[in-house]
A protein has these predicted regions:
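A short glycine-rich, Lys/Arg-flanked "PGG" loop and its adjoining helix->strand segment in the class I
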Residues: 102-115
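A short acidic, Gly/Pro-enriched loop at the edge of an enzyme's catalytic core
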Residues: 80-91
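Conserved class I S-adenosyl-L-methionine
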Residues: 24-30, 115-141
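Conserved Class I S-adenosyl-L-methionine
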Residues: 157-214
Length: 214
């Protein structure tokens, strides 16, 4: 079995690759530069990678060409507003790109028995900022949304890593890459206040899910 690409959950990878992929068309929604899709391409019949960021899709095309992948297709599209049915997917993946709209579109595109596997932000992601992402799910909400859309949840787990810091300076340095985004939405202020009040952690928390269309 091929190993998970760098930065991709091994649990998620195992859930996807435990399926017989050889004759399947895989749709990777919110693909970015194709990290997950291109790693799956050698295992599948065809991979379609969709993202609304045209620059990311251009980079995905370059990476596919450099890797010599001939069974892949790149599409610029908004995965929250476009339908997936025309792609004819047999399996759908989403890595840190998740919303109720994506679940609903995946359900409409997959025939019974086919799999939707994803990694989503968990509501504990960066909990120290005092503001969960609007794209974050807890376990109960994920099950509820999937069941309502017509999926049976086969696997659901939370992967969590809590970084611990010796000082405020160390904690701020670890989050510096997020500073601009957090300053724009108020999360930076809350994180700094958390540190000033004695907090010394930063939590990464992801939800790993495999669901099958009923």
């Amino acid at each position: 079995m091929a190993s998970a690409p760098a930065g991709v959950s091994r649990a998620f990878w195992s859930l996807v690759t435990s399926e017989s992929l050889g004759e399947l068309t895989i749709l990777d929604v919110g693909t970015g530069t194709g990290r997950v899709g291109w790693a799956l391409a050698p295992l599948a019949r065809h991979v379609i990678a969709v993202d609304r960021d045209a620059g990311a899709i251009d980079e995905a095309r370059r990476r596919a060409a450099a890797a010599g992948l001939v069974n892949v297709e790149c599409v610029v599209g908004d995965v929250e507003t476009s339908e997936y049915t025309a792609f004819g997917p047999d399996l759908i993946t989403a890595h840190l790109c998740m919303s109720d709209a994506i679940v609903e579109r995946a359900a409409r595109a997959l025939v019974p028995g086919r799999v939707f596997a994803f990694v989503a932000f968990h509501t504990d992601q960066w909990r120290e900022t005092g503001r969960p992402s609007r794209f974050a799910y807890d376990e109960a909400r994920a099950r509820r949304v999937l069941t309502a859309a017509g999926f049976a949840v086969e696997h659901l787990e939370v992967e969590q890593e809590v970084q611990r810091f010796a000082s405020v300076e160390e904690a701020l340095a670890a989050a510096i890459g997020l500073a601009e985004r957090w300053k724009s939405d108020g999360r930076w202020f809350h994180y700094v206040r958390f540190l000033e009040e004695g907090g010394r952690t930063l939590t990464r928390s992801h939800l790993i899910v495999k669901a099958r269309r009923t």
